[in-house]
Amino acid sequence: MPVGVPKVPYRLPGDVQVQWIDLYNRLYRERILFLGQTVNYEIANQIIGLMLYLNGDDKSKDMYLYINSPGGAVVPGIAIYDTMQFVEPEIRTICMGVAASMGSFILTGGEITKRIALPHARVMIHQPSSSYYKDQAGELIMEAEEVLKLRDCITKVYVQRTGKPISVISEDMERDVFMSAKEAKEYGIVDLVALDVDSNS
């Protein structure tokens, strides 16, 4: 039987009475967001909406985006990334579990110096793939051209955000490249490994 979303106590400023609200609403009040599933239009629109609301609420306070995602659709992922660059508050990205494919792309979009991986997190990068299956040859050609444009866009972002040469990024995106938290730091996808007992990272 599903448990549902847990409720936690919360007291509004100035109120004596404690009210119970769902966990996610409580975390949103602390500017904490989650990407804990496959990236699609629905979750992208939810995260974008929250970022825009929090941007309007207070432009000076950082937001925290926790990522545990196997990746997903490219266009919604790019929309999240672009919104992260658009809003005024700095976005701290934290990888827990896995940030693969578009998950790693969003992870690298956090404010540089404020991108974190937990010690046992995994990161994976690769090239975008087509999510459409068309019958007509002309549509297949158009789809292939669009995938190449998206790949070029993603490659340029990784180059800009990691400091790696375009030749390295292009070669690595030819296959699935998995990294530990420490390797992701060395690669430039994250800046810190949190709670690292093996080093002072």
Curated annotation (Swiss-Prot):
GO biological process, one term: protein quality control for misfolded or incompletely synthesized proteins
Catalytic residues as annotated in Swiss-Prot or TrEMBL: 101 (nucleophile), 126
Keywords for the protein's UniProt record, in alphabetical order: Chloroplast, Hydrolase, Plastid, Protease, Serine protease
Pfam families hit by this protein: CLP_protease
CDD domains in the record: S14_ClpP_2 (cd07017)
Entries under InterPro entries matching the protein: ClpP, ClpP/crotonase-like_dom_sf, ClpP/TepA, ClpP_His_AS, ClpP_Ser_AS
Signal peptide: none
Residues in coiled coil: none
SUPFAM superfamilies per record: ClpP/crotonase
Molecular function GO terms recorded: ATP-dependent peptidase activity; ATPase binding; serine-type endopeptidase activity
Cystine residue pairs: none
GO CC, one annotated term: endopeptidase Clp complex
Gene3D superfamilies: 2-enoyl-CoA Hydratase, Chain A, domain 1
Catalysed reaction, written as an equation: Hydrolysis of proteins to small peptides in the presence of ATP and magnesium. alpha-casein is the usual test substrate. In the absence of ATP, only oligopeptides shorter than five residues are hydrolyzed (such as succinyl-Leu-Tyr-|-NHMec, and Leu-Tyr-Leu-|-Tyr-Trp, in which cleavage of the -Tyr-|-Leu- and -Tyr-|-Trp bonds also occurs)
Subcellular location(s) per record: Plastid, Chloroplast stroma
Principal location class: plastid
Highest rank taxon of the organism: Eukaryota
Keyword Chloroplast (UniProt): yes
Enzyme Commission no: 3.4.21.92
Membrane-spanning parts: none
Record note on quaternary structure: Component of the chloroplastic Clp protease core complex.
Family from the record: Belongs to the peptidase S14 family.
Function: Cleaves peptides in various proteins in a process that requires ATP hydrolysis. Has a chymotrypsin-like activity. Plays a major role in the degradation of misfolded proteins.
HAMAP family referenced in this protein's UniProt entry, alphabetically: ClpP
Protein name per its UniProtKB record: ATP-dependent Clp protease proteolytic subunit
Organism: Chaetosphaeridium globosum
